[in-house]
Regions:
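Catalytic Walker B motif of ABC-type/P-loop ATPase nucleotide-binding domains
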Residues: 124-128, 133
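Conserved coupling/switch loops of ABC nucleotide-binding domains, chiefly the family-specific signature
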Residues: 30-33, 178
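C-terminal coupling/interaction segments
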Residues: 215-257
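ABC transporter nucleotide-binding domain
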Residues: 141-227
């Protein structure tokens, strides 16, 4: 769906990168096929021009300069904004006269992120986009992405382990486990369906006896249980505390189940 930012979440080995590679035509699926507007994506330049995937892998000749890579990208992605790419490189402190092979892990990620933010296609897939970036560069990336997204409607699909960082950015959550989609829901609706209860072990156990528990933590004499459902705050005893779950904690409990 266009004009939406998705978070693709899953544990290591869950199949996130494989799924993105299949969707973007990098590899062929064992069964089934990926279509866009009724046309198969794999080995279809017309459809592939509507899709871009940024990942850890470099698809450019390593001896190529960053500036030349920008020009090269425009040959395939005709709406690539080279002027904006140069401007973003300046913001991130990326020298465009550097060869790609000389870039550090962080600046290699920045180079690929700039490409992703300037290709101007309907579907942009970002696989671990902030790998190697320091806190300042990560914050700059999220800000620039939101600014670009606001003025250029597109679907952004972000696959990342930094769930807490992206939780305020993404609008739709997709969680996969063992190669299958566990859930797909808007972030707000998802977080409204779960909550946590904290208090003494006995008080929490009494409250949660008839609830749908998805996980629990115990520290000393205190216990927290994580519950699927909507709390009736009028019936909450005074000796327990009800709080909303954050996305990272919910992800951990759902994928540990």
């Amino acid at each position: 769906e266009s004009n939406k930012i998705y978070g693709l979440l899953g544990r290591n080995g869950a199949g996130k990168t494989t799924l993105l590679n299949i969707i973007t035509g990098k590899i062929l699926a064992d069964q089934g096929k990926v279509t866009l507007n009724g046309k198969e994506v794999f080995e279809n330049d017309e459809m592939l021009r509507k899709i871009f995937m940024m990942s850890e892998r470099n698809y450019y000749p390593e001896g190529m300069k960053v500036s030349d890579a920008f020009r090269w990208t425009k040959e395939f992605y005709r709406k690539f904004d080279e002027k904006k790419a140069v401007s973003l490189a300046e913001q991130f402190g990326l020298r465009t006269d550097r060869k790609i092979k000389s870039l550090s892990t962080g600046y290699g990620s920045i180079f690929r992120l700039i490409i992703a933010l300037c290709v101007n296609v309907p579907f942009v897939f970002l696989d671990e986009p902030v790998l190697g970036l320091d806190a300042n560069h990560r914050e700059l990336f999220y800000r620039v992405m939101i600014e670009h997204y606001s003025g250029n409607p597109a679907a952004y699909i972000i696959s990342t382990h930094l769930i807490e960082e992206v939780s305020t950015v993404i609008e739709e959550v997709i969680i996969i486990r063992n190669g299958e989609i566990l859930l797909k829901e808007s972030r707000e609706d998802l977080l409204d369906k779960y909550y946590s209860v904290t208090g003494s072990i006995s008080a929490v156990d009494m409250y949660a006896a008839d609830k749908q528990i998805i996980g629990e933590d115990i520290l000393g004499g205190m216990k927290t249980v994580y519950i699927e459902g909507v709390p009736d705050r009028n019936s909450v005893p005074a000796n327990v505390e009800i709080t909303k779950m954050d996305l990272q904690k919910l992800f951990i409990k759902l994928t540990n189940a």
